[in-house]
A protein has these predicted regions:
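Proline/glycine-enriched tight loop/beta-turn segments at coil->beta junctions
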Residues: 73, 82-88
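Intrinsic-disorder/low-complexity accessory segments
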Residues: 26-42, 89-92, 96-100, 124, ...
């Protein structure tokens, strides 16, 4: 199969989405979105057929089932790589079911990385394994709803892990230990204060290691935004309204440091995280297909920045994430239960002298041992020590002062 498609690879990868050639037996498969010219989103059966075709055609690709939704739809993880690598990027696509552009961008990215024979793709996959959850909320996607079939916002479930979707993502992060987590979303604009083609934001949570935080900002400011702007898309910081004349920030409406959002949890778990949001509404009067293509193509432009970052800043990312994973074993420093990198914490939001650990009752341990395990938190029976890689996460799960705690453990101060 690969020898037959070699002649069309470069053109398929370089062409804009609208110009991908018509499907033929010897060309890469196309999504339902592409087949329709942007008139409709890819259906679940089309997605499954598309992924199966890519998997069969490329030995770079493997697909595994990482969970099942309440309505019995598969949660899948796609791995793209040519060999084992020390660096991993995870794309999480459409946690909100009514935000489809990220899913479409992820599907075409899977194909392009699977089929790509250009030097840039080969170089990327030599150093970096790319993991993709192409539809993180299949039930919500089928119903065109933000939440899953129970109405739960998956992107507010990365502490409690009550949903099958949240649990599957937690297990992937625990087991694969990605160095970068890239979370694709969409937003509704508020002209003229909040209306860019793309917004993005790094982990603001103050428990993020400084070097990981710095790399996440570098990913945003020096790679993702310039890549999008080079293709003609406007960019900005998610959650910040700005004056349309001066560009000065005038109001924050989202993007705080709460740990239950994947963007922040990624930082707490020592990965370089970034949220990306494409604007749903068009800036000018255009047809729905044309606007839908803009939504998806802006995401694809930003992804070019992510992959450039992975290649050019890989060594620095490896150093930052590795050091952050080791730092918790020193068991020093405060833990923050509030505040953000742009919102200094109140004294009550800082645990200046954290306990050695937390003791759980037998009933508490029985009730929450699965969630602790999915997070990757190390336990000693019913005792949960702070001296471990995920040191800062332990109080966020078990301390009475943490706003989204799982349960309240008994602090152990006898160190």
């Amino acid at each position: 199969m690969k020898s037959r498609v070699a002649a069309v690879i470069a053109a398929a990868l370089a062409a804009p989405l609208l110009s991908i050639p018509a499907h033929a037996a010897d060309t890469p498969p196309r999504t339902g979105f592409e087949e329709s010219g942007g008139a409709r989103w890819t259906s679940q059966p089309e997605e499954q057929g598309f992924l199966a075709a890519v998997d069969e055609a490329s030995d770079r690709v493997s697909i595994s089932r990482i969970g099942t939704t309440k309505q019995d739809r598969p949660l899948q993880l796609v791995r793209i790589g040519t060999r084992p690598t020390t660096r991993t990027v995870l794309l999480v696509c459409s946690q909100h079911g009514d935000e489809p552009s990220g899913r479409e961008a992820c599907l075409t990215t899977i194909r392009d990385l699977a089929y790509g024979d250009d030097e840039r793709t080969r170089r990327l996959l030599t150093s970096t394994t790319v993991l993709v959850v192409p539809t993180a909320n299949p039930d919500g996607r089928a119903a065109d709803t933000r939440g899953n079939s129970d109405g739960v916002d998956i992107n507010r479930d990365h502490i409690a892990l009550r949903t099958a979707e949240g649990r599957a993502l937690a297990a992937v992060i625990r087991d694969r230990k990605p160095d970068m987590v890239y979370d694709l979303h969409e937003y509704g604009g508020t002209p003229p204060y909040y209306d860019k083609d793309l917004f993005d934001l790094w982990p603001r949570n103050l428990n993020t290691a400084p070097d990981v935080h710095e790399e996440a900002q570098t990913l945003s400011l020096d790679y993702v935004r310039p890549a999008a702007r080079a293709d003609g898309y406007t960019t900005g910081t998610y959650g910040i309204w700005t004056d349309p004349v001066t560009g000065d920030p005038i109001r924050q409406v989202a993007g705080d440091g709460q740990e239950r959002i994947l963007r922040n949890m990624s930082g707490i778990k020592h990965t370089v995280g970034l949220l990306i949001e494409s604007r749903v509404e068009p800036l000018t009067e255009v047809s729905e297909p044309v606007n839908n293509l803009r939504r998806v193509n802006s995401q694809l432009s930003a992804l070019k920045g992510l992959f450039s970052f992975a290649g050019e800043r890989g060594r620095q990312v490896d150093e930052a994430t590795s050091a952050a994973r080791l730092a918790g074993w020193r068991d020093t420093g405060p833990v923050y239960v509030g505040g953000a990198d742009n919102d200094p914490p109140e004294p009550a939001e800082v645990i200046q002298d954290p306990p050695c650990g937390y003791r759980l009752t037998d009933d508490q341990y029985t009730q929450f041992k699965d969630e602790l395990s999915l997070h990757g938190v190390r336990t000693q029976g019913t005792y949960v020590p702070l001296r471990q890689s995920l040191r800062a996460l332990v109080p966020l799960l078990l301390d009475v002062r943490a706003p989204y705690h799982l349960t309240i453990g008994e602090p152990d101060t006898d160190c």
